């Protein structure tokens, strides 16, 4: 097995589950946590079906050779995820260059490679339109050969604190920007509605919580089966089967959601009234659900389409779509909630969510149809599948999706359950809890970006058997986490009044938020260390160590604490926030 670096932050980021939850983003796909049995071929029985109908296409011989022969994607001794194995067969040129640059820097640091090419010129980056000399063409091969030779001969390749600080920081910076954009999708709704009033803010919070628990979390869990199946089909060069699996999963998920859509329209207010004492909040939340239901099919198609592209090694498509849709979402929230001419008030927030879901789906479709990417994503699409093919082999897909549904639901409940308890403390406490949770989610994006960058670096060192360097990376990650958490603590404590005033003009809510933010600031230190250590575990392929404790570590203690603090109403939001953290 090659000892070269093979992981980038792009493929790590692609396995992150995102939603409009007021809790912290940054959950990973269950396929990344729950190992399948070694050498199990989950697409067995469908290969012939796909091969018979696979469309023919022409391409360069070197591209065919680059894709390589199919090998098992479930090798138990390989810590790489299923998405990464498929991506191995279609490196993006920018990612490949970055990995080579990281290897080159380490070789130069250890004096195993000179800083000049064979011709003595400095290494330079060349644009696509510039001619590349023979020395530059030979340089990647020289780096790869030197790296492999050094690893195989047992020569010591070590890193330094300075080098790891630089690499982790540079890899984390674009992730911070991306994750904040993702977070802005939920932030925009909370921010716009919070100025309408405390009850409207509580209605959006309850509606979003119910939508996440009863719909979006289950949908994302169901769609995680594609992380396994599509990666195997694409790795086997059974390209047509990728499109079949994606459409089949979309059909299953949409049909599974139809009964819940009926419940949202007809029974949501009555069901919420059984748990929430404020009847007006239940009515507002039910209206939120009725509008949001129209966007759920778009959300399903987006999740399936995202995995359709990711299994082909195209990880940046959803990010490009996000760069367009996130600003549009903020604009729509302003126009539909606050604008004097077209604004509709409270219902403008869920309507913005609906429009955004469909725009994200449309964005992925436009990208797939117009992209010049060398992987040609439409080679995996052979048109709409017939009805009999859509309703075939459901059991295998559902069995693979069940662990995903269970895990994602457990993670979401760990955060969303506090919303139910906060509603028993009163409307003001519910609004304050929503604002504080939103601030916590936003503050978490910096340490979480460091965590993803760390897991990538650790995975590369583990793959190259450079265990001492892996330890240095983990120490640097902890140090960077301490620095960023200290900055978060300072900002939250120093500007707590200004932050609270941004979200609400209600004096009671502002006071609760101001009183609670010091607790949140104190917990930033532990939050950052939790993210950092989780990244170290993920890079070592030990995600299960963290996953097996999730229900008992998060859900049960928070339920118990939430019950305790919601009994004495005078305790307010501060004690509830202790359970959140």
UniProtKB/Swiss-Prot annotation:
Where is this chain's protein located in or outside the cell?
Membrane
Q: Which GO terms describe its biological process?
A: S-adenosylmethionine biosynthetic process; xenobiotic detoxification by transmembrane export across the plasma membrane
Mind telling me which Pfam families this protein's record contains?
MatE
Tell me the disulfide pairings in this chain: none
**What is the first-listed, main subcellular location in coarse terms?**
membrane
Membrane-related topology note: Multi-pass membrane protein
| Cytoplasmic face residues | 194-248, 303-345, 493-581
Belongs to which family?
Answer: Belongs to the multi antimicrobial extrusion (MATE) (TC 2.A.66.1) family.
Write one Gene Ontology MF term: antiporter activity
Q: What ranges are annotated Extracellular (topological domains)?
A: 1-172, 270-281, 367-471
Signal peptide location in the record? Answer: none
Record CDD domains: MATE_eukaryotic (cd13132)
What stretches pass through the bilayer? 173-193, 249-269, 282-302, 346-366, 472-492
GO CC terms, sorted = membrane
Disordered, as annotated region: 1-67, 117-138
Briefly state the protein's biological role: Probable transporter involved in ethionine resistance. Overproduction leads to accumulation of S-adenosylmethionine.
Ranges annotated as biased composition (Acidic residues): 37-66
Q: Which UniProt keywords apply?
A: Membrane, Transmembrane, Transmembrane helix, Transport
Q: Spell out the protein name for this chain.
A: Ethionine resistance-conferring protein 1
């Amino acid at each position: 097995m090659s000892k070269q670096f093979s992981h980038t932050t792009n493929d790590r980021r692609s396995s992150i589950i995102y939603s409009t939850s007021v809790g912290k983003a940054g959950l990973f796909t269950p396929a990344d946590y729950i190992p399948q049995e070694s050498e199990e071929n989950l697409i067995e029985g469908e290969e012939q079906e796909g091969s018979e109908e696979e469309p023919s296409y022409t391409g360069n011989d070197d591209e065919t050779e680059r894709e390589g022969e199919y090998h098992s994607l479930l090798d138990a001794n390989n810590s790489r995820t299923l998405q990464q194995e498929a991506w191995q067969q279609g490196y993006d040129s920018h990612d490949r260059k970055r990995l080579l640059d990281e290897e080159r820097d380490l070789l130069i640091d250890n004096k195993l490679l000179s800083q000049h090419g064979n011709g003595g010129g400095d290494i330079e980056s060349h644009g696509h339109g510039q001619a590349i000399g023979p020395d530059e063409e030979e340089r990647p091969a020289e780096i790869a050969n030197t790296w492999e030779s050094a690893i195989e001969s047992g020569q010591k390749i070590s890193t330094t604190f300075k080098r790891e600080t630089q690499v982790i920081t540079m890899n984390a910076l674009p992730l911070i920007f991306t994750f904040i954009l993702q977070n802005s999708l939920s932030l925009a709704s909370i921010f716009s509605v919070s100025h309408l009033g405390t009850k409207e803010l509580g209605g959006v919070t309850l509606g979003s919580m119910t939508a996440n628990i009863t719909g979006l979390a289950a949908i994302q869990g169901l769609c995680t089966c594609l992380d396994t199946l599509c990666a195997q089909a694409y790795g086997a060069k059974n390209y047509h089967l990728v499109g079949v699996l994606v459409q089949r999963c979309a059909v299953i998920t949409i049909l599974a959601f139809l009964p819940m859509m009926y419940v949202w329209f007809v029974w949501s207010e009555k069901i919420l009234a059984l748990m929430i004492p404020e009847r007006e909040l239940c009515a507002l939340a039910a209206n939120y659900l009725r509008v949001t239901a129209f966007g759920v099919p778009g959300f399903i198609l987006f999740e399936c389409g995202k995995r359709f592209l990711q299994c082909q090694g195209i990880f940046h498509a959803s990010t490009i779509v996000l760069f367009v849709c996130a600003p549009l979402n903020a604009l729509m929230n302003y126009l539909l909630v606050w604008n004097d001419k077209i604004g509709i008030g409270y219902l403008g927030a869920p309507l913005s969510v609906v429009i955004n879901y469909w725009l994200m789906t449309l964005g992925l479709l436009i990208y797939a149809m117009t992209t010049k990417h060398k992987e040609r994503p439409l080679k995996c699409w052979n048109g709409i599948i017939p009805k009999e093919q859509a309703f075939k082999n459901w059991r295998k897909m559902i069995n693979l999706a069940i662990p995903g549904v269970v895990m994602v639901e457990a993670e979401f409940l760990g955060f969303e359950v506090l919303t139910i308890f906060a509603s028993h403390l009163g409307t003001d406490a519910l609004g304050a809890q929503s604002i504080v949770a939103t601030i916590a989610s936003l503050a978490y994006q910096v340490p979480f970006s460091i965590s993803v960058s760390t897991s990538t670096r650790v995975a590369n060192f583990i793959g190259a058997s450079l265990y001492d360097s892996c330890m240095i990376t983990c120490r640097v990650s902890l140090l960077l986490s301490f620095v960023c958490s200290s900055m978060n603590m300072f900002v939250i404590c120093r500007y707590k009044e200004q932050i609270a005033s941004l979200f609400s003009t209600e004096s009671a809510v502002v006071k609760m938020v101001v009183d609670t933010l010091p607790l949140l600031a104190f917990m930033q230190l532990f939050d950052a260390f939790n993210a950092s250590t989780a990244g170290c575990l993920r890079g070592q392929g030990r995600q299960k160590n963290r996953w097996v404790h999730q229900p008992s570590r998060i859900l049960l203690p928070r339920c118990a604490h939430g019950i305790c603090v919601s009994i004495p109403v005078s305790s307010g939001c501060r004690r509830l926030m202790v359970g959140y953290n």
